[in-house]
């Protein structure tokens, strides 16, 4: 009898929760329509996987890519609409959030073609891979629009859990297992520190969780200059620092980059930084409005350490993926300059513009690593010597992406860095910009060293990997080459058309 009553209560409670969720989705679903498209794509993938065989593999790629493209289209149609706060204050829709969501969707859309041939060659489970990618994308999008401390904590956990699973997707590889273990342990530790910081904000503001209400609560309780806010600032900086991976929170980055499947690294290297940057700008600019000097100082220290350590250690690397890992640490130092500058001197606009270029430069480079690795099975920088003699397209596209990463004119990376540094200079960050300029010169050295290897024609320097290099038929190779072509064009052409891109980015004030 007691069990029967408990069962009825459970059913009633479950029904109430379901009806409440349905009510929220019915009346607020239009505000998260791009996210709903991805959710529908996830459900469709699961349904097709459970009712079909492996011969329907092309459908999996088609559904995933179509969901992402439709979500991008929905975002573009919603551009310029008035800012809206929905789901009882948990989610905010505005141009600033949407442009970061667009960047995340763009990353995912370009990463799926990179994965096609890799999945076929390594015989990985395709459905789970695409499910994790779409779910991580969904988590990143929710993080960009999060408007309260709980959502800001839960959304990156959705992204992080999928990232852990993706990094350990090749279970038979010892390096992949090691990367997953380190990633999981450090990710769990950083999440606990992050939520500890949120708890201090919650208590100091009198029990508020919405970002703007936290500010109002701190004013009402007169706690905006209390030691608790300093503890919250340090804890949240450490938690977000793990997602952005600036020095000294970068220890996981080289090992995860080296041990994870290359398409996964390409995905994580850009999406995690875009989502974390969107979250960092809102958290530091709103709840810590009264502590701007303190968080500016913290971020300046992180930026200096990242630019110096990232670029100097990258010189000594022999693995291509580890080199890009340290390079990404240096690159995030440049992005932090834009976060520090803020809206006052177009800091956010320059940061968004540079991140758009960074996506194309980085993914183009990883496309080359995927293609070369599948042909040769090596990731050693030395083994790329003489690639131009066997595959001129791959070598030239790689050279363009690397030169753009280094910031050489007239490529997009040069103009992106130029505007970013100019905004920092106007804001009075002279020392920070000087460090950025010097470390950019250092980065050009190790990028040019790789390009020199690619273009060498001396037989004594060409390794057996390149001598035995064979291009696959165009049919099996076109997805990687398509992504690479798009990335190369995006990393070169926009350099001569910066003004329209900057104008769009300047409209993203929140």
Curated annotation (Swiss-Prot):
Return the InterPro entries for the record: NADH-Q_OxRdtase_suN/2, ND/Mrp_TM, Ndh2_N
The record's keywords, sorted A to Z, are:
Chloroplast, Membrane, NAD, NADP, Plastid, Plastoquinone, Quinone, Thylakoid, Translocase, Transmembrane, Transmembrane helix, Transport
Which top-level enzyme class is recorded in the Swiss-Prot or TrEMBL entry?
Answer: translocase
Q: Which reaction does it catalyse?
A: a plastoquinone + NADH + (n+1) H(+)(in) = a plastoquinol + NAD(+) + n H(+)(out); a plastoquinone + NADPH + (n+1) H(+)(in) = a plastoquinol + NADP(+) + n H(+)(out)
Q: Which sequence ranges form a coiled-coil region, renumbered to this chain?
A: none
What is a GO molecular function of this protein?
A: NADH dehydrogenase (ubiquinone) activity
**A single GO cellular-component term on record:** chloroplast thylakoid membrane
Instruction: Assign the protein's first listed, main location to one coarse class.
Output: plastid
The membrane topology of this protein is:
Multi-pass membrane protein
Q: Which residues cross the membrane?
A: 24-44, 59-79, 99-119, 124-144, 149-169, 183-203, 229-249, 295-315, 323-343, 347-367, 395-415, 418-438, 484-504
Organism's domain of life?
Eukaryota
- Describe the function of this protein: NDH shuttles electrons from NAD(P)H:plastoquinone, via FMN and iron-sulfur (Fe-S) centers, to quinones in the photosynthetic chain and possibly in a chloroplast respiratory chain. The immediate electron acceptor for the enzyme in this species is believed to be plastoquinone. Couples the redox reaction to proton translocation, and thus conserves the redox energy in a proton gradient.
Quaternary state and partners of this protein?
NDH is composed of at least 16 different subunits, 5 of which are encoded in the nucleus.
Which NCBIfam families does the record cross-reference, listed alphabetically?
A: NDH_I_N, PRK02504.1
Write out the similarity annotation: Belongs to the complex I subunit 2 family.
The name under which this protein is listed is NAD(P)H-quinone oxidoreductase subunit 2, chloroplastic
Name the gene that codes for it: ndhB
């Amino acid at each position: 009898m007691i069990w029967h009553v408990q069962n009825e209560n459970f059913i009633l409670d479950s029904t109430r929760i379901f009806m409440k969720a349905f009510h929220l989705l019915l009346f607020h679903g239009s505000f998260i329509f791009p996210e709903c498209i991805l959710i529908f794509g996830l459900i469709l993938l699961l349904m097709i996987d459970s009712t079909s065989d492996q011969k329907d593999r092309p459908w999996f790629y088609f559904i995933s890519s179509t969901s992402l493209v439709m979500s991008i289209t929905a975002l573009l149609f919603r551009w310029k609409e008035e800012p809206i706060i929905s789901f009882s204050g948990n989610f905010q829709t505005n141009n600033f959030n949407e442009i970061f969501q667009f960047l995340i969707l763009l990353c995912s859309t370009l990463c799926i073609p990179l994965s096609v041939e890799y999945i076929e060659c390594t015989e990985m489970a395709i459905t789970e891979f695409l499910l994790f990618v779409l779910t991580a994308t969904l988590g990143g999008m929710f993080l960009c629009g999060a408007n309260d401390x709980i959502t800001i904590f839960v959304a990156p956990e959705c992204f992080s859990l999928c990232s852990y699973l993706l990094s350990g997707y090749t279970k038979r590889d010892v390096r992949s297992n090691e990367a997953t273990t380190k990633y999981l342990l450090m990710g769990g530790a950083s999440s606990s520190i992050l939520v500890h910081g949120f708890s201090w904000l919650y208590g100091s503001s009198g029990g508020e969780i919405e970002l703007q209400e936290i500010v109002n609560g701190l004013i009402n309780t007169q706690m905006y200059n209390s030691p608790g806010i300093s503890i919250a600032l340090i804890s949240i900086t450490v938690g977000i620092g793990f997602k952005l991976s600036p020095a000294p929170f970068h220890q996981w980055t080289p090992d995860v980059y080296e041990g994870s499947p290359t398409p996964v690294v390409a995905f994580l290297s850009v999406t995690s930084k875009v989502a974390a940057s969107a979250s960092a700008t809102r958290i530091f600019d709103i709840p810590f409005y009264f502590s701007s000097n303190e968080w500016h100082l913290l971020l300046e220290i992180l930026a200096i350490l990242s630019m110096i350590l990232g670029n100097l250690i990258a010189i000594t690397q022999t693995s291509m993926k580890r080199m890009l890992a340290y390079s990404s640490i240096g690159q995030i130092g440049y992005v932090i300059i834009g976060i520090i500058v803020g809206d006052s001197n177009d800091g956010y606009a320059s940061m968004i513009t540079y991140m758009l270029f960074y996506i194309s430069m980085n993914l183009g480079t990883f496309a080359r690593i995927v293609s070369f690795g599948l042909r040769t099975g090596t990731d050693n920088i030395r083994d790329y010597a003489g690639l131009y003699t066997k595959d001129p397209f791959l070598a030239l596209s790689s050279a363009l992406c690397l030169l753009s990463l280094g910031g050489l004119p007239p490529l997009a990376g040069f103009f992106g860095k130029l505007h970013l540094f100019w905004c920092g200079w106007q804001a009075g960050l002279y020392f920070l910009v000087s460090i950025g300029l010097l470390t950019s010169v250092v980065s050009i050295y190790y990028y040019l060293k790789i390009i020199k290897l690619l273009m060498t024609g001396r037989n004594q320097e060409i390794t057996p990997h390149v001598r035995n290099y064979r291009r696959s038929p165009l049919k099996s190779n076109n997805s990687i080459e398509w992504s690479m072509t798009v990335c190369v064009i995006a990393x070169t052409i926009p350099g001569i058309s910066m003004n329209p891109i900057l104008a769009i980015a300047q409209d993203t004030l929140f």
